[in-house]
Amino acid sequence: MKIAVYGKGGIGKSTTSCNISIALARRGKKVLQIGCDPKHDSTFTLTGFLIPTIIDTLQSKDYHYEDVWPEDVIYKGYGGVDCVEAGGPPAGAGCGGYVVGETVKSLKELNAFYEYDIILFDVLGDVVCGGFAAPLNYADYCIIITDNGFDALFAANRIAASVREKAHTHPLRLAGLVGNRTSKRDLIDKYVEACPMPVLEVLPLIEDIRVSRVKGKTLFEMAESQPTLNYVCEFYLNIADQILSQPEGVVPKEIPDRELFSLLSDFYLNPINSGKNENIENNLHDFMII
């Protein structure tokens, strides 16, 4: 099974991906996580350091694939999760989709691409071009990470559009949304009411999730010395169990931008009609679509 994780930049995709990978490994699966970001920090909380990228390794070998060995590009992370960083082209040049393609090609050359029960692609930011959507070409499921905010759900809607487009030519389905570090889910519920899709889990607003990224540890590793965090790990295990049940998933029908803008902004501007919103003044922004 191959999973592509998307979401707005900075929403916590890598932290969530690493913990989902551990949860899948805890369920007895052989897992490979592939970071698809030039920052090559997707697997940082699994390995504790920035591992070399496949592109860097290929460049050092003059792209002689026969000179590349599995141990050159695949690193063992916490909990037995194998880790690969695709890397990316220089800033302002090249295509991220090409890098993903080269990564998959390299893993196939090493006979490693089909050795795993689960391959999880952790993909940078929003889908702004076909290159960034490249991991969807290989995925069975897409998971979108969001929060209870306007911008993240706007990005989620664009990703849903990419899933729908790719589903025309690939056996791809949207497994659902994961709400990350949010104390409420009312806006998420408002969105999925208009654009039906599963909500796999909503993770609580706790500082330890953010701190884990800085420490270079997953919540599972932190829970070994802080048993009070075990309850947070259960959220990720629940996501893993839903994925392993091979859900039917959906081919989403995204909401047109202007309709989504009206839907979400109305939620902020008319809290009486949209339900209670205690922090309306903190969440209100100036929105404008030209």
UniProtKB/Swiss-Prot annotation:
CC cofactor note: Binds 1 [4Fe-4S] cluster per dimer.
Highest taxon of the lineage: Eukaryota
Compartmental location: Plastid, Chloroplast
Cofactor or coenzyme needed: [4Fe-4S] cluster
MF GO annotations: 4 iron, 4 sulfur cluster binding; ATP binding; metal ion binding; oxidoreductase activity, acting on iron-sulfur proteins as donors; oxidoreductase activity, acting on the CH-CH group of donors, iron-sulfur protein as acceptor
E.C. numbers: 1.3.7.7
Keywords: 4Fe-4S, ATP-binding, Chlorophyll biosynthesis, Chloroplast, Iron, Iron-sulfur, Magnesium, Metal-binding, Nucleotide-binding, Oxidoreductase, Photosynthesis, Plastid
Annotated binding of Mg(2+), by residue: 14
Pfam families: Fer4_NifH (PF00142)
Pathway: Porphyrin-containing compound metabolism; chlorophyll biosynthesis (light-independent)
Keyword RNA-binding tagged: no
Binding of [4Fe-4S] cluster, residues: 95, 129
Top EC class, one word: oxidoreductase
Keyword rRNA processing: no
Binding site for ATP: 10-15, 39, 180-181
GO (cellular component) term, any one: chloroplast
Record note on quaternary structure: Homodimer. Protochlorophyllide reductase is composed of three subunits; ChlL, ChlN and ChlB.
Family: Belongs to the NifH/BchL/ChlL family.
Function, as annotated: Component of the dark-operative protochlorophyllide reductase (DPOR) that uses Mg-ATP and reduced ferredoxin to reduce ring D of protochlorophyllide (Pchlide) to form chlorophyllide a (Chlide). This reaction is light-independent. The L component serves as a unique electron donor to the NB-component of the complex, and binds Mg-ATP.
PANTHER family per the UniProt record, alphabetical: LIGHT-INDEPENDENT PROTOCHLOROPHYLLIDE REDUCTASE IRON-SULFUR ATP-BINDING PROTEIN
Record protein name field: Light-independent protochlorophyllide reductase iron-sulfur ATP-binding protein
Top-level taxonomy: Eukaryota, Viridiplantae, Streptophyta, Embryophyta, Tracheophyta
